[in-house]
A protein has these predicted regions:
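A generic structural signal for short, non-catalytic loop/turn and secondary-structure boundary residues
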Residues: 16-18, 62-63, 68, 187
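Generic surface-pattern signal
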Residues: 6, 51, 55-59, 187, ...
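Serine-esterase "nucleophile elbow" of acetyl-processing enzymes
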Residues: 25-115
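Alpha-helical interaction segments
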Residues: 4-7, 36-37, 43, 68, ...
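Solvent-exposed, charged interface segments at domain starts and junctions
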Residues: 4-7, 26, 37-46, 114-126, ...
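Bacterial Sec-dependent N-terminal signal peptides
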Residues: 1-28
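Alpha-helical cap/lid subdomain in secreted, periplasmic
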Residues: 83-86, 105-238
């Protein structure tokens, strides 16, 4: 019996000082409760921003029968858009430096679920900066337009023209061509409008008005957004 107890004691001692046991002793108990990483690597561009929109929506339900602003950073940075259109329920889903491909990719996340009464689109600026042609930008707009029509029916769709800016002045010929193609497409359709802010942002010499922009000469200041507010107001649904 004594021999059996001695053997058992040796086994216990060996286990106590084994690497596995030492590791368990040194590892905090909270390690097992560490949160699981839910964001997988290699997600498409702006995935985190879209996830943040969804998180906010889960906390506070967006207004029903709203006007949805969707597109790139010119909308994202329009943080006072609701104040600029009092009495109009606005959902602003501008994100990143998005292109038409990005908006198309996330349409199921940031357009369809809201069932808006009107969609206002600003996009194409970054597409041209990335080297896409005016015709390519036009085709991507048409794809997005057709997607919205198919899913949301005859709601009003408003396209805000691609804006000129000092930092992208060399792209102005492509901007004008893309704007013209989209304008002509919209002119042949009902429940669709083209808002020309492009020419409102040029000086008499045909250059972008410098004092409408912040230091990066790409994004707008309050003066720039005031022009947009005045141009857009007649096209918004009450």
């Amino acid at each position: 019996m004594k021999k059996t107890l001695t053997t058992f004691a040796l086994i216990v001692l060996c286990w106590a000082f084994s690497p596995t046991a030492l590791l368990r002793a040194q590892t905090p108990a909270t390690t097992a409760a560490a949160p699981v990483q839910t964001i997988a690597p290699n997600q498409p561009p702006f995935w985190n921003e879209i996830a943040e929109f969804k998180r906010r929506d889960s906390i506070q339900r967006p207004p029903a029968n709203a006007i949805l602003f969707v597109g790139s950073s010119s909308f994202r940075k329009w943080t006072g858009v609701q104040n600029d259109f009092p009495g109009y329920p606005i959902i602003n889903r501008g994100f990143g430096g998005s292109t038409f491909d990005d908006v198309i990719r996330y349409a199921g996340d940031i357009i369809y679920p809201y069932h808006p009464k009107e969609v206002v689109i600003y996009c194409g600026d970054n597409d041209l900066a990335a080297g896409r042609s005016a015709k390519k930008v036009y085709k991507r707009f048409v794809k997005l337009y057709d997607m919205i029509r198919k899913r949301l029916g005859n709601i009003d769709i408003v396209f805000v023209s691609i804006k000129p800016s000092p930092s992208r002045e060399k792209l102005m010929p492509e901007m004008e061509q893309a704007n013209d193609l989209i304008r002509n497409f919209i002119a042949e359709r009902s429940h669709a409008s083209f808002v020309d802010v492009y020419h409102l942002m040029l000086n008499p010499q045909g250059h972008p008005i410098d004092n409408l922009f912040v230091a990066d000469k790409l994004h707008m200041n309050e003066k720039g957004y005031k022009i947009w507010q005045q141009a857009l107001l007649p096209y918004l649904d009450k």
